[in-house]
Amino acid sequence: GADVFLLRRVQALTEGFSTPMAGDTPAFVALLHGTLDQVRGGTPRTDVERINYNENINSRLIVRSFGGNDYFAVDDNAALTTLDTGAGDDEVQIGQMYGAPRVSVPAPGTVAAGDDFATIETTAGFLSRGATFSLTAYGGTGNDQFTVYSNKAEIRLEGNDGNDVFVVRAFALKNQPGLSTEETTQAIGGE
């Protein structure tokens, strides 16, 4: 079926630890159950599969979705990353726009305790970093869409088979010079 994946670098890992683990660039990959509309609409299911990791992961983080019309949202990463979307009409979103900073305090926050993450204030809202470590995304078969709002490291997007769409947007930063997509983005359409 259709899967919804969330990749995010966070302030600290708290679940399962007596003391929050904040060193070594903590991050997680989560498989959010339910539909993309449920997740976006603020009514996601509570059964989430989450894997915590940090920059000391051996080699590379690889996330495979296999079949289905899957969605990958990347707010940030903490290691070299490969996304393999497999078969289906998939979407990969690198960097997301929010209406407020993603902080846990003051209560009630916009994220769970420890899951705070950096955003950049733009003229359109608060933008997540996208990718701090190099990222490669493979579209596999199907008509895939790749959208980049922000990247702080080189990213490579490979459409593979099907009619794929590549969108790279730049946002003006608020109160500072520069744009949100200043790093290298390679888009390869495939066959």
Which residue ranges define each predicted feature?
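Acidic, glycine-rich low-complexity segments
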Residues: 1-191
